[in-house]
Every structure is written in structure tokens, then in C-alpha cells.
Amino acid sequence: MNTDPDIADAFKKMDLTGARRHVFLCVGPNCCATEAGLATWDVLKARLKEMNLPALRTKAACFRICRGGPWLVVYPEAVWYGGVTPERCERIVREHIVGGRPVEEWIAQTHPLL
């Protein structure tokens, strides 16, 4: 196990013990304009922080779909959403991440890993 104190501090700040979901967002440039992806990222980041939600977030450059983005994936359910605008992101945060109910009309795929 790594004993570097800076790495240990980084993990402590992430508070992995409290996380209930991990949200990944592809911000382009192949599936969408980078500006569109980053606008959605800004909303996701702000809402999770404002609401103090027990969720991790990760910004990604490519999910290898390369069309129909920005793409957002919510784990542990492994629900894939395509075309996630800032407005759609708001609803996904409210209904899926907070309420536990995936937004059915925007689901492109589900693929639980376990």
C-alpha cells in the first residue's frame, strides 16, 4: 500500500467512505463540442457541491462512443445517459442521484459491472 502522506491526504479529502455514487462525464471533443461538455460539467460539479451529495465525480475525455454526447454514467447502477445538456444534468442530479430514480427517457444503456 502506498504510504505517501500527500496521496493519503488526497484520498481523505475525497471522503470515499461516504460516497454512494460515482458519476463520470465525458466532455468531448469527439462526442460533443468541448464547450458543451464543460458547461454540463460545471452544472454537475456545482449541484453535487451545493447539495453536499455523497457522490464522487470524474471528468473524462472519451468514453469511445464519439457521438451523441456529452455522456454521463452513474455508478453503481451503470446507467448511461447521452446528450446531457446542463438542463438535463439538473434533472438527472435531482431524480437519479438524489432520488434514486433513473431518468428513463434519456437512458441509452445500462450495464451493471457486478
List PLM regions with ranges.
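Local cysteine-cluster metal-coordination motifs and their immediate loop/turn environment
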Residues: 20-35, 58-77
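Conserved helix-turn-beta segment immediately C-terminal to the redox Cys motif
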Residues: 41-55
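Iron-sulfur (Fe-S) cluster-binding modules
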Residues: 1-25, 29-31, 49-52, 78, ...
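Conserved strand-to-helix beginnings and helix N-cap segments that scaffold or border functional pockets
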Residues: 37-38, 86
